[in-house]
UniProtKB/Swiss-Prot annotation:
This is DNA polymerase III subunit alpha. It comes from Staphylococcus epidermidis (strain ATCC 12228 / FDA PCI 1200). DNA polymerase III is a complex, multichain enzyme responsible for most of the replicative synthesis in bacteria. This DNA polymerase also exhibits 3' to 5' exonuclease activity. The alpha chain is the DNA polymerase. Belongs to the DNA polymerase type-C family. DnaE subfamily. The keyword Ubl conjugation does not apply. PANTHER family: DNA POLYMERASE III SUBUNIT ALPHA (PTHR32294:SF0). The keyword Nucleotidyltransferase applies. It is an enzyme of class 2 (transferase). SUPFAM superfamilies: AF1531-like (SSF160975), PHP domain-like (SSF89550). InterPro entries: DNA_pol3_alpha_NTPase_dom, DNA_pol3_alpha_thumb_dom, DNA_pol3_finger, DnaE2/DnaE/PolC, DNAPol_HHH, NA-bd_OB_tRNA, PHP_dom, Pol/His_phosphatase_N.
Length: 1065
């Protein structure tokens, strides 16, 4: 016997450690002829198992373990598919089990599908006779070798295999402990296990009967199911009048061509070309299906992106409304998207606004029906950090040890435990004791195994037949899922469309709706001008916070250097700012400003590379060069591009010769042909799809346009989308203030959960206030909308429900200014809280009873709280300052010291800051240093204080104080940071500065005020301080006199003139 009929792979989640690759390797070495995958209830591993078996020339058998019940007794049962019909039966049984969350399978379910299945009962006892008899007369029915001897039936050897070798037995109790969240009793549980994958030699020692061997061979011969890949499973689109999809598609396309007045012959010829390829390849239904769902979205208040990926290169997509990018206008190639030489399903991914994406999915589900639409499964795995903690937990490690493990494993994508072991600290931990060594061994054996299922973020499968006919289904958080991954589902021929949710589309849509509601202006984003100077000024200034694709510090730096003037500049920046092509950015910018420096390897390359100043940026440029120079069809050119990006040496050499031969046939010399090939080879690795770049640059431009022309609405919506992120909110608030947009305190009669734009400024969200949850805000707003604005603080307190009214809520609202609209100081309102909390709640809810039975409420007027305290409360409850930041206030008062802000400071200039975060660490040498986050009231920046500077302040440095810092600016991870060399408390710095000053300069002052007469001194006095007036308009300095160097005179100067107009030098 050379078949194993009962293998549980690692896709039997947390119940097997048998990896398919390792299983097949061992099976091949041992000489196994056939293997059967029999995971319990699920078929997750089928495609991977099938592919691995075929590659190793092993006969794959498809099966499943189920627990069959007659309602009284249950028996472990293995069912195997005889043929492809049996395979479909397994799909349907598994789907039913997973969709109905069944642990046991009723006999009736199996009997419905048993015609094309082999049934093997395991460890059958007399109590199971009724279940076995239910299948009386079925020829392909077996009992396994250790079933009760008194039962009649054909016998076959069948023993579960759940781990590879005998010494892997410990993996099963470990997996079970992880699954059940229990502690691991390794020694006890290992003794009971005997489920390794045996060698052929071990099978031979079992002395199996001839009947068992014959039956096993018989089963192997009977099982001939195969997974059919690349089936034609596209659903048919139902046309309105019963005409063919081809005819219906052509009718729509011609109508749109005329309707949009695209009468140029080039459009018609391009349309005929694309239509022929699409219909020849049988994809007309696909385009109609996608067009239909996008049409639904656009007519049901769901914003759709202009395009995504290479599909924006299709004129058919444009005419159907799938994209809003005219491919001829932007010189985009259809063949980058679809061509006859690359016979794969076209890939149209769609961006929807993220808050309404589910509406479109619901439409598709309703249109195609139950079981016809599903999401796609993904698997979470036991990766290094997770498996290390899981195994540590089940082995009883305390929290300190678990945290130590987490710190010892580097934060690196794809890190393995073996790689972590190369670090001395990790190795020392492993060998600290025997328990840690066992922990490491068990963790390594489990590392990488699938742990749980999840849902693919975007993929949706659609068919006009129930999906369980083609693949097994399961359920996830969002509904039905295929049990197979995206790649596997697509490979069998199922239609997959990515429904992606894009937050920026939601922001754009909300801005459009609010502008219409408040200003009665209809913004048609398809009609905005793409040569708006204000937009390009914004981009050139790098004011791109909140702009899709353009808001990182690195991109802003590029925009400032580039000074974009055309839409094409945006397309280029979004394509270049990625690892790889970034190195071409300086070249691109230099040539953009100096076009005369552009040189082309050959004149024929100029029309293709002119827009990008001789730099190859886009994949389409590679295809155009291959077509122009070597005479490649665009399909051949796309194959060349793909071969270049994959760097397959054998294919590359073949394509190189193909290119050179084609170029020579076109009249190019061999040397220039080689040079051009090498040129495109250099850029092929990171060339970007131009169609995608144009699509996403359009979103970036639209957002920039809205930011320029409707800034209040732009910032309000960006802020609404970062509620919950204190850091992002603070940064956006600071920028809005910098743009001179008023940020208004929360207003109990104006604010909502989201930020609200108004002609006065932007009202803060009630949801921003710490300690006030969504339900409380909802109740406050609902009451206001139903019964009108709140009249005063007492009216508010009476009308809100008792379950949300408490001291914490009222204090929070008062201290952030939500009741300022009523004209009372915050101190007065705080004094009134006790009054409103003492009232009888039942009386409050009845306005008439309230007026009759309660004494007249009155305020005890109090002076307002000090400015600093008000600011502190704002920071405490909001995470940022609404009014001027205390550092900004201090800066305005102390400008006479010649201090700077983070945004305009240079190396070693004094900058006034406060530390928002201080992270103290110990170096390898045992010295303390600190990483800090600095705030100057407008800008936040990270900083470093090294040990030699930090030791002076490590016991006194505080987030409550302000400091003057000096240091060197450096870029780290594309972000500026300050290496702090000197740090002073403000008072100490001021005292030193004033004491050492030699002169004072007064801006735009021509003479000293009379009050300084008594302070004047003769020029030869030792303690004299020279006073100069500086005339800005004339750029002229004039000596105004001298005063005695005394603190009282300094203070008099500061009181008499604006701090901004004084500089002590």
């Amino acid at each position: 016997m050379v078949a194993h009929l009962n293998i549980h792979t690692s896709f039997d989640l947390l119940d097997s450690s048998l990896r398919i690759d390792a299983l097949i390797d061992k099976a091949k070495k041992e000489g196994y002829r056939a293997l059967a995958i029999t995971d319990t209830n699920v078929l997750y591993g089928y495609p991977k198992f099938y592919d691995a078996c075929i590659a190793a020339h092993i006969h794959p058998i498809f099966g499943m373990t189920i627990y069959l019940t007659d309602g009284l007794y249950t028996i472990e049962t293995v069912v195997l598919a005889k043929n492809n019909q049996g395979l479909k039966s397994l799909y349907q049984i598994s789907s039913a089990i997973m969709m109905r969350n069944k642990e046991e399978v009723p006999i009736e379910w199996l009997k419905r599908y048993d015609e094309h299945l082999i049934i093997i009962f395991k460890e059958a006892e007399l109590s199971h006779k009724q279940i076995i008899d239910a299948f009386e007369g079925k020829k392909e029915l077996y009992l396994n070798h250790n079933s009760n001897n008194t039962l009649t039936g054909k016998r076959v050897w069948m023993q579960s295999a759940r781990y590879l070798n005998e010494d892997d037995a410990e993996t099963i109790p470990a997996l079970h402990a992880i699954r059940d969240n229990t502690k691991l009793d390794l020694i006890h549980e290992k003794e009971t296990l005997d489920e390794h994958f045996p060698s052929i030699e071990e099978l031979q020692t079992l002395n199996l009967s001839e009947d068992m061997i014959t039956n096993a061979n018989e089963i192997e011969e009977l099982c001939q199911a195969e997974i059919a890949y690349h089936q034609s499973l596209l659903p048919q689109f139902v046309t309105p009048n019963g005409e063919t999809s081809k005819d219906y598609l052509w009718t729509i396309l011609i109508h749109r061509l005329r309707e949009w007045e695209l009468n140029d012959k080039t459009y018609f010829n391009r349309l005929k070309h694309e239509y022929k390829i699409i219909t020849d390849m049988g994809f007309e239904d696909y385009f109609l299906i996608v067009s239909d769902l996008i049409h639904f979205a656009k007519t049901h208040e769901v914003m759709v992106g202009p395009g995504r990926g290479s599909s924006a290169g299709s004129l058919v997509s444009y005419l159907l409304g799938i994209t809003t990018i005219d491919p001829l206008k932007y010189n985009l190639l259809f063949e980058r998207f679809l061509n006859p030489e690359r016979v794969t399903m076209p890939d149209i991914d769609i961006d929807f606004e993220d808050t309404r994406r589910e509406k479109v999915i619901k439409y598709v589900q309703d249109k195609y029906g139950e079981h016809h639409v599903s999401g796609i499964v993904t698997f979470g795995h036991l990766l290094a950090r997770a498996v290390a903690r899981d195994v540590g937990r089940i082995m009883g490690f305390d929290e300190t040890s678990l945290n130590e493990i987490s710190k010892l494993i580097p934060h690196k994508l794809g890190i393995t435990l073996e790689e972590a072991y190369q670090k001395p600290e990790f190795k020392a931990f492993v060998h600290r004791n025997h328990r840690n060594e066992r922990w490491f061994e068990v963790s390594k054996k489990l590392e990488g195994l699938p742990r749980h299922t999840s849902t693919h973020a975007a993929g949706i499968i659609i068919n006009d037949q129930p999906l369980f006919k083609f693949a097994p289904l399961t359920t996830g958080d969002t509904g039905l899922l295929t049990q197979w991954t995206m790649t596997e589902a697509e490979r069998i021929g199922l239609l997959k469309i990515d429904f992606l949710g894009l937050r920026n589309l939601s922001i754009i849509h909300q801005i459009i709706l609010q502008v219409k509601k408040d200003l009665n202006i209809n913004i048609d984003i398809e009609a905005i001008p793409y040569d708006d100077k204000k937009v390009f000024d914004l981009l050139s200034n790098g004011d791109t916070t909140g702009i899709f694709q353009l808001e990182s510090d690195g991109v802003r730096s590029v925009l400032k250097r580039l000074q974009p003037e055309h839409f094409e500049d945006i397309v280029a920046v979004t394509s270049l700012y990625r690892p790889g092509p970034m190195e071409e950015i300086p070249t691109y910018i230099t040539r953009r400003h100096n076009p005369n420096q552009v040189a082309y390897l050959h004149p024929d390359l100029e029309p293709i590379l002119k827009n990008t100043y001789g730099v190859i940026i886009y994949q389409e440029q590679i295809m155009l060069i291959a077509s122009q120079v070597a005479g490649f069809s665009y399909g051949e050119a796309d194959i060349l591009r793909r071969a270049m990006s994959k760097k397959n040496r054998a294919i590359l050499e073949s394509e190189r010769q193909h290119f050179i031969d084609g170029a020579k046939n076109n009249g190019y010399g061999e040397q220039i042909s080689k040079q051009i090939f090498d040129l495109i080879l250099k850029f092929a690795d990171y060339g970007f799809p131009r169609a995608h770049a144009v699509s996403y640059s359009k979103i970036a431009y639209i957002m920039s346009y809205l930011k320029v022309h409707y800034p209040h609405y732009f910032y309000a919506n960006i802020l609404s989308n970062v509620i919950g992120s204190e850091k992002k909110t603070a940064a956006m608030i600071d920028e809005a203030k910098h743009q001179r947009i008023s940020i208004l305190p929360p207003n109990i009669n104006q604010s909502h959960w989201y930020y609200k734009a108004s002609n006065k400024g932007i009202y803060l969200s009630l949801g921003t206030i710490k300690g006030i949850g969504y339900q409380s805000v909802k109740l406050i707003i609902d009451e206001r909308q139903q019964n009108g604005p709140y009249r005063d603080f007492f009216d508010f307190s009476r009308r809100i429900p008792k379950r949300v009214k408490n001291r914490k809520l009222l204090e929070s609202l008062i201290l952030v200014g939500a009741f300022d609209t009523f004209g009372k100081t915050r101190a007065t309102l705080l004094q009134a809280i006790d009054q409103v909390l003492d009232l009888n709640s039942d009386v409050e809810q009845d306005e008439m009873l309230f007026d009759l039975l309660t004494p007249k409420q009155s305020y005890e007027e109090k002076e307002e709280l000090p400015d600093q305290l008000l600011s502190d409360y704002e920071k405490e409850y909001l995470g940022f300052y609404i009014s001027k930041h205390p550092v900004e206030k201090k800066f305005e008062k102390k400008q006479y010291l010649g201090i700077f802000q983070l945004s305009n400071g240079s190396h070693y200039q004094p900058i006034l800051v406060q530390f928002d975060h201080i992270k103290q660490i110990r170096t390898k040498n045992g010295q303390n240093m600190a990483f800090v986050t600095m705030n100057d009231g407008r800008t936040m920046m990270d900083g470093v204080i090294f040990p030699d500077k930090f030791k002076k302040f490590e016991t006194s440095i505080s987030k409550e104080q302000m400091y003057i810092v000096l240091g060197k600016f450096e870029k780290r991870n594309q972000q500026m940071q300050l290496i702090i060399n000197q740090l002073f408390e403000v008072e100490a710095y001021e005292q030193t500065k004033l004491s050492n000053s030699k002169k004072v300069i007064l801006r735009n002052v021509t003479h000293l005020e009379p009050q300084f007469e008594h302070s004047k001194v003769e020029s030869n006095e030792q303690h004299a301080l020279n006073i100069y007036g500086f005339d800005e308009s004339a750029n002229k300095m004039t000596m105004l006199g001298q005063i005695e160097r005394q603190r009282q005179n300094f203070d008099l100067l500061i009181q008499t003139y604006s701090p901004a107009d004084i500089r002590f030098i």
